[in-house]
Regions:
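Cysteine-centric segments in proteins
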Residues: 1-109
């Protein structure tokens, strides 16, 4: 991916953060994995509607589990993120077979 561009993510008054961050979209995720296999996400990048690369830091991991959807194993990770001083809860999914990350949904904003 390209170098991250620093842009304002403040949504217009009629849009929520969940509408600014694309849901169910592939992302680039930076993580650290400890000796027990627990994944610690640090930040993620995505391409916004203006085709700019946006980087968002992850504040903390709230929960993590392995789930099976229609025969596909995925890591489901719920994290707290901060976008323009607004704390949000986001759900990320990591497909174990394809080894790809996506932001599944922004749960609250």
């Amino acid at each position: 991916m390209e170098e991250a561009t620093s842009i304002s993510l403040i949504p217009p008054k009629n849009r929520r953060i969940g509408e600014i961050i694309p849901e169910n979209t592939p992302i680039q995720m930076a993580t650290v994995t400890d000796s027990t296999g627990y994944i610690h996400p640090k930040w993620f990048k995505f391409q916004n509607e203006e085709r700019m690369i946006v980087k968002i830091d992850i504040e903390r991991v709230m929960c993590q589990e392995t789930v099976k959807y229609a025969g596909i194993f995925e890591k489901r990770i719920i994290c707290s993120i901060i976008v323009n001083d607004i704390r949000c809860v986001a759900e990320f999914r990591y497909n174990i077979e394809s080894q790809r990350w996506r932001i599944f949904q922004v749960i609250s904003s």
